[in-house]
């Protein structure tokens, strides 16, 4: 049966259909005004890691009114498409083959997409495109030996991106992790407990990423059989937790591995006594703490404690877990609608670790502050809104963990019946600080104008402040004063009516006239020699220059005279050298700058003393730099001349306010190159001078002046912040602690005050390592610091939910650790019968600081009785003299190093045997050398036994050869004389008389007359010098006490004299002991060789002493030239050195 037919629908009237159609149109998503929605991102690019030659797609999809154009930026610069890089239809970026560092152009970097439509543009978050990389192993397993039943630990460390997965192999096979006593930590550590013989073998780790795989070196584990009975020992943590910095949602492991008998129990706690999160935390292996899905609340200090069961014996180790978090918004900017000439304020706040950096964008471009637009930490303020300000604004928060953006739109509403802009604006310069501005009334609705506003700002530079002046409608000109001289300004005018403001007028730019400089340059004075002063100065800041400096006038005079000498220098000059001055005199110097208008104010007289004229080499003046840090603090920096070879013991710093007494000296160490002067007065001029000094005298000083600026008031605060603590004082307590003390600010309204101390090493780059400590006292002992490290400290106070600024920074160094080792290379050399020279080298270790050495020496008899003789030397000296030694004894010598913290261990004992004196030699050698003489002889006579033997053999051979030659010459001379006599008797020839003048003595000339055929044999065979060396030797005569240069006075050679006279005079010739005088100040050794009873036969020898002249000895003497103060000996560090004469004897062979 067919279904019944449905009744036909009733026809609706046309009016109802029309209303339904209109409702459908209103609800339909039509384009244009009907479907307007703000521009936003549906998908943004994300961080990605790829391998070379792989394709990659960075997503970017925007939503809003079409058409939407998408462009891409890489590292802030616009990208262009090519064969490899293409922007897809949905806005995403496609790279077909990623190029790495080896290619011509790397694709690594930060990418952002920019979406734009007719309402504005927005910028996406940053996405980092990185290549998969892996480095070489930073830490590899090390072979070890472990007792059976003990614990073994191997470690691997490697840097890679993404992080590598580390596994372990045992004897080249994968190490199973099924046993509880073996634990492999994700950080690359392998732990083995209850080691047995089956664990012996080779271990290595394997690091693998998606694209790389590396194997470490093998390390062997040797198991030593255990003893039958194990002795008790307290727990020891052999691998404690390390400080870790991680990101949110990562997994971290805090290692804690301990040994002991019995096996210790390992427990974990937090230093702040908070409970450990049990849901995301578990113990891995035998005591390692693993935290998964790390959150901000997991940050803190964790303490590992190893305890002996059933006892209170325990040991602890701790580490800090720092959790970094990407930025997140706390407050978002909201879209605004404002009229023309109104003010718009956007507020945006974000948090993160580390604190994010805030910036603002307009249509995807970074905003820079100017007169109308100002940016604070969390605000964007736009004054005097113009139509061009209608745009989309974004707040961007960025830190090391990422970036986020939030957007808002500013809509500018314009009134239809507003007046037109003022026109025909022009400016005229009136003076160095005033400009006249004039304009015409608006062409339309000028009768409705109720006021004008004049806007002006500096034309040069960024972040210039814009100023506004409101005047009535009854005038069309205005004089703007209080302007800066020699500056360009930009002006525009706005007209106001009850319905709103007009458009801006055209901009005009005009400059002010020049003026005289507001203040003089700040000068620096140094000396390079005792007769000059180098005057240098910095250019005057533009704020105070007030024009172009064309001239400097330099004035100087002696402090004891009234006459002033004046020099005029070009405006491009910034230093001048005054020469021809008097040494050790005080000079006064001042300077004046001038522009085209005229001279400005002169500086105050600055004094400088020229150095003394002395032969002692004093340290040169350091290069000094002063910089005001704030209105009460000046940073003093300096640098010593690298070419300065003078020894420096430290620095002296003086400073004074202009017209006040000088403060100082402040003694600074040689390592200090920075000092902060705090607690100064604002807007004051200070004079600072610095010099280097040593144990001899002060060096050349550097003088400089600097002015402190005025204090700037804190803006945008209803309640002013409290003042910071002052008079912060630091003093080193130990090598790992510094005591701080400060004063409370002078206010008593609040009773409860807390302080925060900031502490970090100078030059620290990682901000997460800065230490913050809390206290309610005005003093604190900061512990756990590194030895011999310079730290900076600052303090701020907290009261009534307000925090003060940080106090001026104070720098101080921890004390060094006591020397851990003894001096090395100890050597003892006998240089006289009763004097020995001991030398050494500083203890090993670059961080070892030595301020004093202690030398203990004693004979064996005294050593057995415990009686030591003690000498002390400064840390810069590495040698000393041991005097008054007794012959026939064996001496024991040992040395230790010490500093202000403590004394290090003594070196191994070194023995020195002093041989008994021989009677024949005892009368010919000096009995004793004092300290001053030893200083001279140490450069020449530091010879060992082998060297003395070689010299003696050489001298003996030389004397034998000379004696043979003399005998041969005498024999030949007799033969020739006999032949000449016979020839004279025969009357055949006659000798020219000129030949006789070549011989020494009249007697020889008479005997040689008449020799004709043997003229050449009558020439002297030896020149007046001691000898002739064809190899370029010197006329040096060496005896057992060192080298002596013979005088060049003429002598009579024996073989030129008559043989009869020789026989008569030979018995009368004798050698007397030579006397050597050491004359203080001349350093010359004088030897009188002949007896005072035989005048006319005197032959003197002289030789100036100096280490530099002994080129041969410097290659063979060890320890005598290691310091610049070598030879500066005394029994005590404060003994005076007396220079005395030394009586010496000349051996008979000379």
Swiss-Prot record:
It is found in: Membrane. GO terms for cellular component: extracellular space; plasma membrane. Glycans are attached at residues 90, 488, 630. Gene3D superfamilies: Immunoglobulins (2.60.40.10). Residues 1-35 form the signal peptide. GO terms for molecular function: identical protein binding; signaling receptor activity. One of its GO terms (biological process) is cell-cell adhesion. Residues 36-949 are extracellular. Keywords: Developmental protein, Disulfide bond, Glycoprotein, Immunoglobulin domain, Membrane, Repeat, Signal, Transmembrane, Transmembrane helix. Residues 981-1002, 1086-1150 are annotated as: Disordered. Pfam families: fn3, I-set, Ig_3. Residues 983-1000, 1092-1102, 1141-1150 have a biased composition (Polar residues). Residues 36-130, 135-222, 235-322, 327-411 form the Ig-like domain. InterPro entries: FN3_dom, FN3_sf, Ig-like_dom, Ig-like_dom_sf, Ig-like_fold, Ig_I-set, Ig_sub, Ig_sub2. Residues 1110-1138 have a biased composition (Basic and acidic residues). PROSITE patterns: FN3, IG_LIKE. Disulfide bonds join 60-113, 156-205, 256-304, 348-395. May play a role in anteroposterior axis elongation. Belongs to the immunoglobulin superfamily. DCC family. This is Protogenin. It comes from Homo sapiens.
